[in-house]
Amino acid sequence: MRKDLLILTDILKANVAPALGCTEPGAVAYAVSKAREILGEEPREVYVAVDRDILKNGMFVSIPGTKEKGLVFAAALALVCGKSEYKLEALREATEEDIKKAHKIVNRKAVKIVLEKDAEGLYIKASVVGDKHRATVIVKDAHDNIVYEERDGVVLKAKEENLKEDKSWLKAKIKEFTIEDFLDYCDSVDFKEIEFIGEGIEMNKKIAYAGLNEEVGVGIGKMLKRQIRDEESLAKALTAAASEARMSGYPLPVMSSAGSGNHGLVAILPIAIIGEERGYDREKIIRAITLSHLLTAYVKAYIGVLSPICGCGVAAGVGMSAGLTYLLGGSRKQIKGAVSNMLAGLSGMICDGAKIGCAYKLSISVTAALEASKFAMENIFIPSDNGILGNTAEESIKNLGRISVEGMKNADDVILDIMLKKQ
């Protein structure tokens, strides 16, 4: 394998990790947990400042193992029992007694969540106050990337001292590669280097079948279950059911992709289900999912970690379309064509926060990615003179990034304003 591609293994490991519940409340819980540990005494209250996308995505999503929603309860529960060693799964050991204590914290209004209007990109600042001390932690650029720690005005860690742990530079480095590079990597990398990718198959299938067979959410998974007739409809039903369970707070982790659990569901499940049902060997399936993860991360690097564009539907959908076409034996031209087909059809899906309705968006994404791949396998490619498409798949992705970063600057403000008025 080409030496310049070796870093893609590190990029994969930085992007693919387990997450319990929605990533945004998990990230807030992680920051609060770390601040509470630094505090070194009984916490009295916590102040959390977040960027608009963290606020938007954490507002109406359920907290695993509880019947509660939102960032306030996530922060309160982290004050009681959060463990920073588990990072985005900081709340995974919460008990019923812990939940009762968290309710008391919320009821005495000891948790304040505020919008940091000037924050650029992903930003969480958690300040935990006790009777004698105060501790502050800042998470930036990635959900699990702590860049600053302080206790009573004394800086314990700053970004400059934390470069080895800061993976945001590593995630951004993916922009230096092309789809050809990703394909060379997936074809030639030693299977042992990417075997860990397979852990996400079993992890995500477990919550998918829970969502399909148990009473969760509003019944999206159950309805799609009644429509299962082949491996493609099974893949769609399981992906949507997994998201519905996750957004409802079902207490099982998922394997994330590019910093999001829902991204991981789309990037992994459809390829795994279709591959297994059609009898493909496990190595081929994992190599295809590896391509899916790489394309998902590539799109996210351009549209932003948190974006007005639905990353679960569009970014992970692009990854899925490429990975599925790879699995089915498509040529490199067809794989790139599937990417452009997907962007031609679904690039306009917005992100209006994490919630149960995301399950429906994932269902739509899987359907679109299946069709984008089928079109490509039949050598049907949406022409490059259509809309935002570029002359190459990479150009199309970069154009989507321009729309997200330059063209939708006010979209999140409007979306968030609409959501806040419903509280």
From Swiss-Prot:
GO terms for biological process: L-cysteine catabolic process to pyruvate. Pfam families: SDH_alpha. It comes from the Bacteria. One of its GO terms (molecular function) is L-cysteine desulfhydrase activity. It comes from Caldanaerobacter subterraneus subsp. tengcongensis (strain DSM 15242 / JCM 11007 / NBRC 100824 / MB4). This is UPF0597 protein TTE0269. Coiled coil: none annotated. Belongs to the UPF0597 family.
